[in-house]
């Protein structure tokens, strides 16, 4: 055994790591490994099995249900071009959260079971279990290396010490498995970003430790492992979530204080030497030769350079992907970021305490901490500054302990715990840039690893050095902590079952957050409970009177309740909250796109009144003037212009919208409708096809293009038309229009039985579907089943009394097949009631008179019909036949029954044009 020339400074032992592995095999039995493995698995499953019964809620809606990047028809490359929510990274409204690997796993889930929540939650549970097991392995490695490097002897820790360290690692992973603050990351499906990133995060650390520790000497490096495994894991972690980049910082801490055994004071001394060469003479205690030699190690600088280089490279790449722009958030997302100095800095400091408190006491958890959840600290006199001060004192005390303790194992373990707590939290700390939230529980998933290790290490120290009573007390306290955490986690999962239960749990915790009340209102609104939703929206307005979104919600709910005057008033109030233009003063103000919805909603409400369409158009133009790239305003304005029959202008508006969003299927569809209105079917079909290319499930484009193809005719056109109609049915099997058009296709192919079934299905879904009712009746009549057609024709006339073709067909069946002239006459007279100049209805009424042998009345009727339609030859022919018969009857005696019947009910004035009827002049009184 060699002697150490510098007491308190322990030299690195080249044989430490190999001997450590030998010792591990002797002290770590397979039975214990299996038992710990099973305990962690059981803890995870017991805590989170009920999460698989939860639905897709909160952020899951945007990231999964509404994210087109998950759909199989979306090009896979889009996953790497868009942000986590499916918005192109180049767009201003993008959240700039680039997590393509996480989105790929969502896409895989969608491929297997679409939007069924169970699979998404099951994957999250398994990922959390994997993180816990990996964390146990990392803790074992870390604790043994810290203990070995801090030993006074070259040999590794004793067998009993290794066993205690393994217990510490097990406790850390078990506490991590059951901690309630992880519920949002595990039960919320979007938390998969944290889970995947953590797996790659831990794998990166293990690969780094392997690359610098395989040889047993810190002067050697396995560069292949470092570049290949570590680099890949670091990149993958960052592509799952941005926090993953911080593993490079943890590896720097590990390299300095564990691998090269530097002490924090060595680091201070080195920094001082950079600024003052005399430090060594003035501070001999700091000028430790061993520390200097370690700093001069070329291996250390090569590895640090590698870590810094790869980190900077990835950061530059990340900035490039973001388009060199930070995401833009509103002041409601993070109120402190919009506050003045010193309120902003004091609030940021208080948020650090709040995050620490959530780790220490996760009793009051909330899904949303934005808006007024945490009131801003009002200067230095705010009493909450005390908690901030105590937090920083506690952290400072731990830092001081690492610097001045002579127990090097303790020092290095504390350093790694602090590094694991602090570094992953830095991106969310507002230190470098303001973030879009106040507190986010899932952000604490990685930092909580360091916290759990710190608690476990404290427990291990009590077990090792405390008295028997302290050991029993610490064991009982740990058991209670694990049990209460597990129960809280299990109970917290129940809050995530539905959006309503989740947001109500938030309201119970925090009554100052207007967004929570808005979200409860949205949940009730989705269930059709508009009256209840209105109460929560109005409460949100009372809490945050300047929140435009809350006023919009109130207006929309009034609109759903058909209280249009109150809805308009709410929208006007929201509109009044926008920055007002001042004459002669120019200024720039950023308007959130979702706030501009007030113009859309107000215009849509006004447009219900046909006399106010121009006013609605003005609102759309006003919204466009505020944001020229506001595509939804262009789309809605185009609809208004179509109602105003200004199709050319509507076309220009839609084409302008394409300049800002040329991948919006709705715009291409609307352009297709414009060309359809202009009678340009071929151009319309081109735009419908483009809409389908961009969004293969676009229902209206599929339906309209199928109809155009059907009208085009031809076997290939009918085949494509049918495939598109069936595509619509895959997503909406209750669409009566699809069944009707499938029936029409079957008619074209003479598949009458199939057509009949499609028409009946359409009528079953919509009892007053006039086209389906008439075409089914016509089909039955044409296939020699006229009596079967009568019920459908009567149903048609009941819902649509003025349906002329239906009345004519029904009248014909009454005459030709049922011989019911009275009902036939009712049908034809009904036609003339709605359309007095309908030639066919009038002619058929004349035929009824002929069938009744009322020839005089029939002749007058046909003469009237001929005057209405002189070009119709068949009327003239029938008139000549009736007149010839009437001439023969007129030769009979007046008392003859045939002659009496011929002139029965005859009124010479019944069938006369208005100008042919005699007028009666009134005499003036003298």
Curated annotation (Swiss-Prot):
PROSITE patterns: TPR, TPR_REGION. It comes from the Eukaryota. Residues 1-36, 136-169, 214-222, 260-303, 367-384, 441-442 are cytoplasmic. The chain crosses the membrane at residues 37-57, 115-135, 170-190, 193-213, 223-239, 240-259, 304-324, 346-366, 385-405, 420-440, 443-463. TPR repeats lie at residues 514-547, 548-581, 596-630, 631-664, 665-698, 736-769, 770-803, 805-838, 839-872. Glycans are attached at residues 609, 645. SMART domains: TPR. Keywords: Endoplasmic reticulum, Glycoprotein, Membrane, Repeat, TPR repeat, Transferase, Transmembrane, Transmembrane helix. It holds the Pfam family TPR_2. Residues 1-26 are annotated as: Disordered. It is an enzyme of class 2 (transferase). Its EC number is 2.4.1.109. It is a multi-pass membrane protein. Gene3D superfamilies: Tetratricopeptide repeat domain. Residues 58-114, 191-192, 325-345, 406-419, 464-926 are extracellular. PANTHER family: PROTEIN O-MANNOSYL-TRANSFERASE TMTC3 (PTHR44395:SF1), PTHR44395. Transfers mannosyl residues to the hydroxyl group of serine or threonine residues. This is Protein O-mannosyl-transferase Tmtc3. The lineage of its organism: Eukaryota, Metazoa, Ecdysozoa, Arthropoda, Hexapoda. The gene is Tmtc3.
